């Protein structure tokens, strides 16, 4: 993993990756809707545990609605994150996620699984580091929790978002921020929290090397944007959540 051996590297670096491939997410959605896994066939049934889905950068819970609905259908108590649009300061986004975790924990009387796409997975890791007593596991889908290595367009969008939300904090949305959330990324995940990192080597948004965990990693085919619409990912989730 070269520079991604451990910890969270603060520098944002533009990488040359095939952003144009992301349009193929429409094909992935079509394939998912016709796949037996979307109807719950050929996979283990859920055990009623709480699962929270967390959208990626610039996205809302509408983007993960297919996944949330599917999790409910196969036997889990699935909750949207409650973040609204994920384009705010990461510390403030976390503060909106935490009540959802508290609610899911209370309603099911058990630890919660967090499934985060891209930046949503980064938030999941922060939440699990800070509150391991309430988190059973995290599943990250193309989440660059080792450092922001992304297509130049994504970095420009990040810069634009930062200029609007934290003009008084120039390092917001970067690894140089001194907020508690970024500090949590530099801390090892508590051993009692399981972590499954799912990634694709044809990611057109972030460098897939930045998405690898220390233990369980699963490579899938497809796009970054399409990870929440991937039948292959859904099968992995059904097995992992058991």
PLM-predicted stretches and their roles:
Residues 1-52, 59-70, 74, 81, ...:
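Flexible, membrane-associating and regulatory peripheral segments of lipid-active enzymes
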Residues 2-9, 18-21, 159, 168, ...:
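Alpha/beta hydrolase fold serine-hydrolase catalytic domain that processes acyl esters and thioesters
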Residues 24, 30, 155, 183-186, ...:
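Generic detector of well-ordered alpha-helical segments enriched in charged/polar residues
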Residues 29-35, 41, 60, 86, ...:
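Surface-exposed loop/turn and secondary-structure junction residues enriched for glycine/proline
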């Amino acid at each position: 993993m070269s520079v991604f051996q451990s910890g969270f590297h603060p520098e944002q670096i533009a990488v040359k990756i095939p952003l144009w491939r992301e349009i193929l997410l429409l094909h992935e959605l079509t394939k998912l809707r016709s796949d037996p896994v979307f109807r719950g066939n050929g996979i283990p049934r859920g055990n009623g545990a709480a699962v929270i889905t967390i959208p990626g950068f610039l996205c809302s819970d509408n983007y993960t609605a297919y996944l949330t609905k599917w999790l409910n259908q196969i036997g889990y108590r699935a909750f949207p994150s409650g973040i609204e649009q994920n384009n705010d300061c990461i510390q403030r986004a976390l503060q909106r996620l935490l009540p959802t975790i508290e609610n899911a924990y209370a309603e099911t009387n058990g630890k919660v699984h967090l499934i985060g796409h891209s930046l949503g997975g980064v938030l999941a890791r922060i939440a699990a580091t800070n509150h391991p007593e309430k988190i059973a596991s995290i599943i990250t889908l193309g989440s660059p929790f080792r450092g922001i290595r992304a297509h130049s367009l994504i970095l420009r969008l990040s810069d634009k978002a930062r200029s609007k939300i934290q003009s008084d904090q120039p390092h917001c949305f970067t690894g140089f921020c001194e907020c508690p959330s970024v500090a949590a990324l530099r801390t090892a995940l508590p051993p009692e929290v399981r972590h499954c990192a799912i990634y694709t080597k044809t990611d057109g948004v972030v460098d897939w090397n930045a998405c690898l965990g220390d233990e369980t990693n699963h490579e899938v085919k497809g796009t970054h944007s399409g990870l929440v619409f991937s039948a292959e990912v859904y099968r992995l989730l059904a097995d992992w959540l058991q």
